[in-house]
Design a protein with these regions (language model features):
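Conserved phosphate/metal-binding and DNA-contacting active-site motifs used
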Residues: 1-204
């Protein structure tokens, strides 16, 4: 139910844009609209309903626009959950606590059955981060069968970028899902073993 999912995402303060269905690894995560405007503001629910009607069978889900329009949202994208675990284990205590209590979305499946991880962090107003990719000093004995990218990579995404939101079907055949999130996370967006955090309302 895309309108309900969109309404929930908007209620959590995210600016969203519609994405085309993922047909294969070369034609994935593609916006269905010109999205410059939504780097400055979030759409209204009526705009979203129009997208759902207009794109119908082509709609694969929504992307989350990072940075200021989503409440100063920083997303850390780990290509493999072992890279996420390494980062957490080596992060300073306050950073580790922040990340462990932030919303966590699982992404595509890798060759070893493990998944990528997106961590959503809201920064204080006035703070910003440069978009960048970082190769972490960890060996991961797996691969993405569809793409030739290192799985020890961390993608840092803020203003001017977007990430695929929960509910989207990845080309590996699984849906992006929320592993840790607000207690009112819709059932269709929850990963198996979902953990709801009552205090996450304060994060929004």
């Amino acid at each position: 139910n895309w309108p309900d999912i969109a309404n929930w995402l908007l209620d959590k303060g995210f600016s969203i844009i519609p994405l085309a269905k993922c047909e294969d690894a070369s034609n994935c995560k593609r916006p269905l609209i010109q999205w410059d405007e939504y780097q400055r503001r979030a759409p209204g629910i009526e705009e979203v309903r129009k997208w759902v009607r207009e794109f119908k069978d082509r709609l694969g889900g929504f992307a989350i626009v990072c940075g200021k329009p989503s409440g100063n949202l920083l997303v850390l994208g780990f290509e493999h959950e072992d890279a996420y675990k390494w980062f957490i284990e080596n992060a300073p205590g306050q950073v580790r606590q922040l990340l462990e209590n932030s919303m966590r979305v699982l992404t595509g499946v890798r060759s070893d059955g493990k998944r990528g991880v997106h961590v959503y962090v809201r920064l204080p107003a006035g703070y910003g981060v440069r978009n960048t990719d970082i190769v972490l000093p960890i060996q991961i004995n797996a691969e993405d069968p569809h793409k030739k990218e290192p799985l020890n990579k961390l993608e840092v995404r803020f203003d001017g970028r977007y990430v695929v939101g929960p509910g989207y079907r990845h080309y590996s055949g699984v849906d992006y899902c929320i592993a840790i999130g607000p207690e009112d996370t819709p059932g269709e967006l929850r990963c198996q073993g979902f953990v709801g955090k009552p205090d996450m309302a304060l994060w929004y």
